[in-house]
Structure formats: C-alpha cells, structure tokens
Amino acid sequence: MITCLPLLAGEGARRKGDIGMRNKNKRLAQYATELRRNMTDAEYALWYHLRNKLFCGIRFNRQVIIGHYIVDFCSRKLKLVIELDGIQHVEQEQYDLERTKFLTAQGYKVIRFWNDEVLKNIDNVLEAIYVEIEHLSPPHFGSSPHKWVEPRLEVLK
C-alpha cells in the first residue's frame, strides 16, 4: 500500500535551497556575460581564430560555465577547455590546480597558455590546440597539421 502525505511548507516545486542555487547560477551567468563583453587582448586574439567554427570546423564558446567555474574557451563536443593565464595566475596556482582537477573529473581536457604566448606567438598556440583536437577527434580529422583553418570561398560582387 502506498500512502501519499501532503507536502510540508516549503516543499514542492520551489525550495529555499533551489532559489539560492538559481541566484548563484544567475550571478555566475551575469559575470560570464560581463567577461565576454570585456575580453583581454589575448582572449580577443585567440577568439578571432576560434569563433564561428573557423578553427578546424570545431565550435568553441567563450566564457563557458562548467560547474561553478567559468572557463575561457570550450568545445563541449570535444570536451576541450582552453585557458589563458595572465600574471595573476602565478599567485593563484592552487586555485587553478583545483579548477583543472574539477574539470578533468568532468571529462574535460584542459590546456593552458600564457597571455604573452598568445599575443607574441599565436601560430604556436594554434598548432598546440590543433594537436589536442587531433587527439580528441575521430581518426578522419584533418589532413595537414599546418592547415588548421578550413578555406572559405568569398563571393565578390
């Protein structure tokens, strides 16, 4: 025999804990939006190559929420996270290790680059990302390690 008891006050579709989590996620989403609007020079330089599936036809998003973290760039399909580190990351090494551990536990591969590296040597950064994509993709992916951008035809009027 199954007995149905009436809901107690605060039970049902909304609980106090749920509201707190929703507010936390909303704040995180607002912060991610703010970060997208105010990219660093290095983030902008890399995003120029990753946006609109320009890089190997892979979709990347910027400032993506995973758990309670915001990552710089992410391909959810490949479960690849790209993080760009500035000088502040020297002081928050433990925090970055915890983030990476969490993301890895969620099945993501995390690769990191220094902002200076992106700004001064974007080709090497793109090559390193390409190599990771090759490892994470099916065997038929790509034909040449130096041709990471698919050619696009432009119609001239």
Swiss-Prot record:
Annotated signal peptide: none
A matching Pfam family: DUF559
Superkingdom: Bacteria
Recorded family membership: To E.coli YcjD and H.influenzae HI_0925.
Protein name: Uncharacterized protein HI_1162
Lineage start: Bacteria, Pseudomonadati, Pseudomonadota, Gammaproteobacteria, Pasteurellales
